[in-house]
Amino acid sequence: MKENWDACFAMVLKHEGGFVNHPKDPGGMTNLGVTRTNWELYLDHDVTEADMRALTPEMVKPFYKKNYWDRIRGDELPSGVDYAAYDLAVNSGTSRAAKYLQQIAGVTVDGVIGPQSLKAIQKCDAEDVVDEVCNMRMDFLKNLGTFETFGKGWTVRVNDVKAKATEMA
């Protein structure tokens, strides 16, 4: 829902944290959850480590809205579903988030939330959708080769998202 955007953005940033450059993270250099590669694509020019370290929530908020919230049509998703899908999109991609929602709603799975997908999702029970999205997400994460390194943090994150999204639903 449109009115949930600011809260959802803040909750995602809480999980994303600050600057990291973990050697086992395939995303590489990251700050506030934004990878260097994605930030360079967004700005359409190269950035330095100093640029990455200097990122602020105000700087990255439009990036998150354009690249994640808008792509999953967060303004139009039911409350709670918006947060669960948005956090999933940030962590594992907008296509995966859309596909999970489409699968749950029983519509054609193409990875893009269009009018038919949106209508079907809106007819579903929001708490059930949140539960299923989070379960599917954990199943996916547990099968990643990096789960041994990052799994504990991902599990805490998904459990927190599930609890907060369920409260919102």
Q: Where do the model's predicted regions map?
A:
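Cell-wall polysaccharide-cleaving catalytic domain and substrate-binding groove, primarily
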Residues: 1-169
